[in-house]
A protein has these predicted regions:
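The feature captures the LRR N-terminal capping module
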Residues: 1-14
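Structural signature of tandem-repeat unit edges
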Residues: 11-25, 35-48, 58-71, 81-94, ...
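Consensus positions within tandem repeat domains that build extended binding/scaffold surfaces
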Residues: 5-6, 27-30, 50-53, 73-78, ...
Length: 146
């Protein structure tokens, strides 16, 4: 099944994955636990990053989430202990429970024009490197769950 999700030019050593352009939803656990994964190229048509899609991908250092993504689901990047940098596109309406928990995120870019409605419980739990001054929650966010 994984072959359906990745392009032929993906590195055979598993360090880089290029997701097929026709994919709009990453289902739960798509790349969960691929510890050697260092780089992911997500398609422009992507709308949703599913539950645990990249959980425990310990080699992942940066993720560029394409414009058009509306949901980063529960625990999507949980345990990506080397993930330091992430951008949140302006179309995102929700960040799920523990979505970025236990990562090494130092700074998170959330645009002022974001249409976000919620950041769920513990979305950034255990992110000890994240300086709260670098987490700017825009006015458009209706609520942050405890």
């Amino acid at each position: 099944m994984l072959r359906d999700w990745i392009k032929e030019n993906t590195k055979s050593d598993g360090t880089t994955i290029i997701v097929n352009e026709n994919i709009s939803i990453l289902p739960p656990r798509t790349f969960d636990g691929i510890t050697g994964l260092q780089e992911v190229v997500l398609p422009k048509k992507l709308k949703k990053i599913g539950i645990l899609s990249f959980a425990w991908c310990k080699g992942l250092r940066e993720i560029i989430i394409p414009d058009g993504v509306v949901l980063i689901d529960d625990e999507a990047f949980r345990g990506c202990v080397n993930l330091e940098k992430v951008n949140i596109p302006s179309e995102v309406v929700g960040i799920g429970k523990m979505a970025f928990a236990f990562t090494a995120i130092r700074e998170i870019v959330i645009p002022d024009s974001i249409s976000i409605r919620y950041i769920d419980k513990g979305a950034f739990y255990g992110c000890s490197m994240l300086d709260k001054k670098c987490l700017n929650i825009p006015d458009g966010c209706d609520f942050i769950k405890d």
